[in-house]
Structure formats: structure tokens, C-alpha cells
């Protein structure tokens, strides 16, 4: 893909995103990684000084109890399965170091994907502010 445009639940000043409030973050991440440019459109409530929980998780149903123990503190969402049949949960712990947390979550058996999107994926963020918008560029090609 040349260009992918999507929203975000949180946008940090350094370009880290939390996505997946709707439970489709695995597919969203695949599409964003496949695109040459990934542009996020957000309203003025989405930029945050620092990321915080909850961070969406997609988990395998097999070994769910063990996976939940390893990613604690976390809770299961009372929602349907993801588009690919995964169980949707939320991580509620600290997100002060999103890079380390992303590695930890990605390395946990049973975690299909998490909703942390690193800044190297993000080309630009457009933040709507009433009748205008601010553009924040994160990588070349914007």
C-alpha cells in the first residue's frame, strides 16, 4: 500500500500510539506495517503527555489463564472475539516505557498482538482542533 489512514486511541509526543479500542489492532498493525506511509487522524482528545492503560491485547484462547497471569495486570473484555477469533483483553499496568512493554508483551506466549504502535511506523498525525488541524511529522515521506 502507498498510504494507510487510521485513527488512534492515544498519541504520545514521541509518536508512540495506543490503538485497538475496537479490538481490530492486529489487522490494523498488519495494514500499517504494509503501507509506505501511515497517517493517523485524531481529534484533540487523543494526544496525551504520556501513554497510559488500558492497552488492548489480542490473545489466544488456548492457555488463556496462563497468558493472563503473565501479562498482569490485565482484564478480559466482555466483547465478541476479534475478527480473527482472538480473545480481547486490556493491559492495565504502567506504560512509562512503551518500547520495553511492547517487547515484553510480544514475547509472551499466547499474546497474538498488542495495541502499542511504535513511532517508526507513523508517518504523520493530523489532530483536528475545531475548524483547523495540526500536523505532526514523525518520519520522512510524509
Q: Language-model segments: which ranges?
A:
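Conserved phosphate- and dinucleotide-binding cores of soluble alpha/beta proteins
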Residues: 1-142
